[in-house]
């Protein structure tokens, strides 16, 4: 049994969906009605990710969806709301955001790979194997930092590499749960360093 009951999960999904929709409606004033289509797409794919007749997460699409819905869409939409345009220069930052957040999904799928394989959940780690999952975790974090060479997120790399070494050493089991917290902290640090680097570059 998991830590969260199905009823609590449904309640949590409903509350977070309503909160996200409320925030999105507030942004329509600044970004225009076209943002409504973006919001609807986000809600639709959030549902299709693990629900519906063919859950995308069970078909190995999770990592690609993270790049789109945690990278290109939020970064692009944020830029659009503030400037009214989405220049091509936004793409590297958007990809970096998607890659660094994907490290959390990769680690989660790495931890659950054996159970996922038994239940028919064909994540990228299940399809490619544990060693490939370890390499993807390392590459995603380092790739995100490489896309921001002129900015501060390079300081994130040593922490990410240290987390990767622990991941390889642990291999499997509940001890990987603590590494999820470490990876989340590293993602937060990456975001703060990126924001600070952009702010300093504009000075």
Model regions and ranges:
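Cytosolic, membrane-interface loops and tails of multi-pass inner-membrane proteins
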Residues: 1-4, 105-130, 164-178
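Multi-pass membrane catalytic core of lipid/isoprenoid biosynthesis enzymes
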Residues: 1-30, 121-150, 184-193
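Membrane-embedded alpha-helical segments that form the functional core of polytopic membrane enzymes
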Residues: 36-47, 87-107
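Small-residue-rich segments of transmembrane alpha-helices in multi-pass membrane proteins
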Residues: 64-79, 97, 126-130, 181-194
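Alpha-helical transmembrane segments
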Residues: 89-103, 115, 130-171
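Extended hydrophobic alpha-helices typical of membrane-associated regions
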Residues: 150-203
């Amino acid at each position: 049994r998991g830590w969260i009951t199905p009823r609590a999960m449904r309640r949590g999904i409903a509350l977070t969906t309503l909160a996200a929709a409320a925030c999105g409606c507030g942004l329509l004033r600044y970004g225009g009605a076209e943002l409504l289509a973006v919001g609807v797409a986000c809600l639709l794919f959030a549902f299709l990710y693990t629900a519906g007749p063919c859950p995308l997460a069970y078909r190995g699409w999770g990592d690609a969806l993270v790049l789109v819905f945690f990278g290109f869409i939020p970064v692009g939409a944020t830029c659009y709301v503030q400037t009214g345009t989405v220049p091509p220069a936004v793409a590297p930052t958007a990809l970096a955001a998607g890659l660094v957040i994907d490290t959390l999904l990769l680690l989660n799928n790495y931890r659950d790979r054996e159970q996922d394989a038994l239940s028919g959940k064909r994540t990228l780690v299940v399809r490619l194997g544990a060693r490939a999952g370890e390499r993807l975790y390392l590459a995603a974090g380092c790739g995100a930092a490489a896309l921001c060479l002129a900015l501060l997120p390079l300081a994130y790399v040593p922490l990410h590499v240290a987390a990767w070494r622990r991941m390889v050493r642990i291999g499997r089991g509940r001890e990987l749960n603590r590494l999820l917290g470490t990876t989340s902290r590293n993602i937060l640090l990456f975001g703060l360093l990126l924001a600070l680097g952009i702010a300093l570059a504009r000075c």
